[in-house]
Regions:
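"…together with the soluble PPM/PP2C metallo-phosphatase catalytic core" -> "…together
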Residues: 1-191
Length: 191
């Protein structure tokens, strides 16, 4: 139900917002390196992450357990990584080139926000199960990670975020990698 509600939220707003962005020339600046086919994508409205994150946040607030610390940590990570992406896209539009935030700046902020979120999870854990590695098909087996939970979790959060960013690197249009990423994570979370 929450997925359907997020989709309806997107469908309700997406056309109006994309048309407004086209009028204001909020289009993707394409790198000159790479295949010529990517140049055709120049001018495609950018900052779609705002729509996707808006739908996710809306759905979480409507259907999530607002008493759960996990929901609020999820919203913190989504919002903070979304802010990094927004700033990156904003700088690209402002400067009219494909250079946004530097890679080092992005990684610094991603690691910083992930460290904050994971530290809260680790230090507020009520049981060792909360900081254990549980394999989807072998739920009876769990590996207690101790302090390594922090390092592994940061690696997974930053790595997952950058899996999409690096995949869409040439043209900056991340919808298909995002769909695949979200689908895979959704399946694992469901198990």
């Amino acid at each position: 139900i929450s997925t359907i509600k997020a989709l309806l939220f997107l469908l309700f707003f997406v056309n109006q917002i994309i048309n407004d962005w086209k009028k204001q020339n909020y289009g993707q600046v394409i790198r000159s390196v790479g295949p010529e086919s990517h140049l055709e994508k120049g001018g495609t409205p950018t900052m779609g992450g705002i729509l996707i994150l808006g739908a996710i946040i809306f759905s979480c607030l409507c259907w999530g357990d607002l008493q759960s610390k996990f929901l609020w940590i999820l919203l913190f990570i989504i919002s903070s990584f979304g802010a990094i992406g927004f700033l990156d896209d904003y700088l690209k539009l402002k400067n009219q080139n494909s250079d946004g935030l530097s890679g080092k700046s992005k990684l610094f902020w991603q690691f910083s926000f992930a460290l904050i979120a994971v530290s809260i999870l680790y230090f507020s854990a009520e049981t060792t199960q909360e900081t254990s590695l549980i394999l989807p098909f072998f739920k009876e087996f769990s590996l207690q990670l101790g302090i390594w939970f922090i390092f592994l979790s940061i690696f997974v959060i930053v790595g997952t975020s950058n899996a999409v960013n690096l995949t869409d690197g040439l043209d900056g249009l991340a919808i298909m990698p995002s769909v695949m990423d979200a689908g895979g994570l959704g399946i694992v979370a469901y198990m």
